[in-house]
A protein has these predicted regions:
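Nucleic-acid nuclease catalytic cores
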Residues: 248, 290-309
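Interdomain motor-coupling "hinge/lid" segment immediately C-terminal to the ATP-binding subdomain
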Residues: 41-43, 47-149, 185
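Conserved P-loop NTPase "ATPase switch" module shared by AAA+ and STAND
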Residues: 4-21
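Structural recognition of the conserved hydrophobic beta-strand(s) that form the central parallel beta-sheet
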Residues: 11, 35-41, 62
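Active-site ExK catalytic segment of metal-dependent nucleases
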Residues: 262-273
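Domain-level recognition of nuclease-like catalytic cores that cleave nucleotide substrates
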Residues: 301-323
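Conserved catalytic/switch belt of AAA+ P-loop NTPases
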Residues: 22-38, 51-52
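Accessory nucleic acid-recognition modules appended to NTPase machines
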Residues: 103-263
Length: 323
């Protein structure tokens, strides 16, 4: 109980695990000399009764692992290209920094702790999920398919063919739990010309490439293009955009980023040194039919280039910029 007239700052972490916490938070909030900060690792925090009690009276700040710009600020090394390759592999969880500076062999232990907490406490315990094998199989499938359009039926059929019994309904419930725990994110498909959302074959992205590397092992390194895409997706979220996958006729724009200023289009590729690859990556951006900014992001070390209004930028430079 606070009876003093002094100013107080109250920090509550994972308070959703305490029965009746909503009323306690509300009683603190109504005091003029108290600022309340609530942190949590899943979407349940602002669901239900608390959202009703605090409706219109709170600001939600969504947090993600370290951006590449934040990551490099912790190192004296200014070889950004090498640091970026490390970032692609190890991810941006804050604890990575000290581990990479001291004993890199401890990295998997650290990531295992994070993964176990999310899966066993935030997901299994809260959702009364008992089939650990099935849940981990769904997670591995999505982690292995980042940046590719997938359906619930496709996941269910694939797992069933491997002898893991499940149903579309169960897979859908598991994916909902993964989304609410912020382990994965869903990018809906956006019809660029019709300016409307399409209701199938979403793409999913993982919250941290290091967690993906931990879970998939060496297999994780076989798809660097989609890892790069995943990093760009998360960076667009950090910059305050709603992010969709664009459809233009029979072509695809990797990302349509939307904010109050309008749209931006992004295409992501490891390299476009091959002329045919360059033409392919530019084609979907050229067909959008509007004048919103269009950017092609690659790992190529060339100088920034302009192709009739489409900017080609090195992705490391873009990540370090304030666009």
């Amino acid at each position: 109980k606070i009876i003093s007239e002094d100013n107080f700052y109250v920090f509550l972490d994972e308070v959703q695990n305490v029965p009746g916490f909503q009323r306690a938070v509300d009683s603190l909030y109504i005091k003029k000399n108290v600022d309340v900060y609530i942190t949590g690792s899943n979407a349940y925090l602002l669901s239900g009764e608390l959202a009703t009690l605090l409706s219109g009276r709170y600001i939600e700040i969504k947090m993600l692992p370290l951006s590449f710009k934040e990551y490099v600020s912790a190192f004296d090394n200014n070889n950004y290209q090498q640091l970026f390759l490390d970032y692609m592999r190890n991810g941006g969880m804050p604890g990575n920094i000290n581990i990479l500076k001291s004993n890199v062999n401890d990295l998997d232990k650290y990531l295992d702790g994070i993964f176990s907490t999310i899966v066993y406490k935030d997901i299994m315990a809260r959702n009364n999920i008992t089939d650990k094998l099935l849940l981990e199989s769904v997670i591995k499938y999505i982690f292995d398919s980042i940046g590719s359009p997938i359906s619930i039926k496709k996941i269910s059929d694939t797992l069933t063919s491997k002898g893991i019994s499940t149903s579309n309904h169960t897979v859908e419930n598991y994916i909902t739990a993964l989304l609410e725990s912020f382990l994965i994110y869903k990018a809906e498909r956006f019809d660029v010309k019709g300016k409307n959302l399409l209701a199938r074959d979403y793409k999913y992205y993982v919250v941290d490439s290091g967690l993906r590397s931990y879970l998939l092992g060496k297999k994780a390194d076989s798809d660097m293009g989609h890892i790069l895409e995943n990093i760009v997706y998360l960076e667009l979220l950090r910059r305050g955009y709603k992010v969709y996958v664009g459809k233009v006729d029979d072509l695809e724009v990797d990302f349509v980023a939307e904010n109050r200023d309008g749209l931006r289009y992004y295409q992501v590729a490891l390299t476009v040194r091959d002329e045919k690859v360059l033409e392919r990556e530019l084609r979907s951006l050229q067909k959008t039919g509007d004048h919103y900014p269009k950017t092609l992001l690659t790992l190529d070390m060339d100088l920034e280039t302009d192709y009739d209004g489409i900017k080609k930028i090195n992705v490391v430079d873009w990540l370090l910029s304030d666009e």
